[in-house]
């Protein structure tokens, strides 16, 4: 069942905060977003379940810039990190509704943007207020060279609004207060933008091959980290062992 976790229950409502509810009458509830006239929201491609007639969906190139440069950048990110070239923008010419569902079973965390900004790992993005902004940031190629789990780019938020991130499995929030935390990259959902982080192979390349451990993130400083309880790549590998092959 999908759940929404509010990260700051005491914070005041802001004008551009996303208004959304969870339909809990279903075994796997949907996120339903209320859009006012002229309102918009960015959403994960393929996450739309339904919308009212005054809501329109438009596909946009995923990234900043314009023209050929933006197209080349989107193609390049898609080739090297597996990230989608496109993002969907929903716009409303009146009061409307839009329902979304993540592509994996798990939880949804609502992150309020303003004083706090976040970075998202690959596959964690679900929706973002149209009043907020995001950019795709290139990671140090040495950090992500052997990744396959987070890619060479991460999404970084800017501005005011609400971000919805989704997980595979349950979400746990970790708060760092000047310390250090090492986390398997496949379990990282999102983290505070002000945190320093380093992506590398656990114990080096050969040791990682021998132990089966993959890419890890080491975070330092003050901020929040959201992790997921399940590893999508390991889950896919488990299922693969039971799938028939052409030789069977």
Curated annotation (Swiss-Prot):
Transmembrane segments: none annotated. It holds the Pfam family AIM24. InterPro entries: AIM24, AIM24_sf, Trp_RNA-bd_attenuator-like_dom. Signal peptide: none annotated. SUPFAM superfamilies: TRAP-like. NCBIfam families: TIGR00266 family protein. This is Uncharacterized protein M6_Spy0233. It comes from Streptococcus pyogenes serotype M6 (strain ATCC BAA-946 / MGAS10394).
């Amino acid at each position: 069942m999908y759940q929404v976790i509010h990260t700051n229950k005491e914070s005041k409502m802001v004008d551009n905060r996303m208004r959304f509810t969870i339909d809990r009458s279903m075994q796997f509830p949907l996120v339903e977003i209320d859009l006012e006239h002229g309102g918009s929201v960015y959403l994960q491609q393929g996450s739309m379940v339904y919308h009212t007639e005054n809501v329109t969906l438009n596909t946009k190139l995923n990234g900043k810039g314009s023209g050929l440069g933006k197209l080349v950048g989107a193609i390049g990110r898609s080739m090297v990190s597996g990230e989608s070239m496109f993002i969907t923008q929903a716009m409303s010419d009146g009061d409307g509704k839009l329902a979304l569902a993540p592509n994996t079973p798990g939880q949804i965390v609502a992150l309020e943007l303003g004083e706090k900004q976040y970075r998202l790992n690959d596959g964690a993005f679900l929706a973002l207020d149209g009043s907020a902004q995001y950019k795709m940031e290139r990671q140090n190629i040495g950090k992500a060279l052997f990744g396959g789990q987070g890619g060479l780019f991460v999404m970084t938020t800017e501005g005011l609004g609400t971000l919805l991130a989704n997980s595979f499995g349950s979400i746990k929030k970790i708060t760092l207060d000047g310390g250090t935390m090492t986390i398997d990259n496949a379990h990282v959902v999102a983290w505070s933008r002000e945190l320093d982080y380093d992506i590398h192979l656990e114990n080096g390349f050969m040791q990682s091959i021998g132990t089966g451990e993959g890419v890890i993130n080491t975070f330092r400083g003050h901020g929040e980290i959201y992790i997921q309880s399940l590893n999508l790549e390991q889950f896919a590998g488990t299922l693969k062992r039971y799938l028939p092959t052409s030789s069977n």
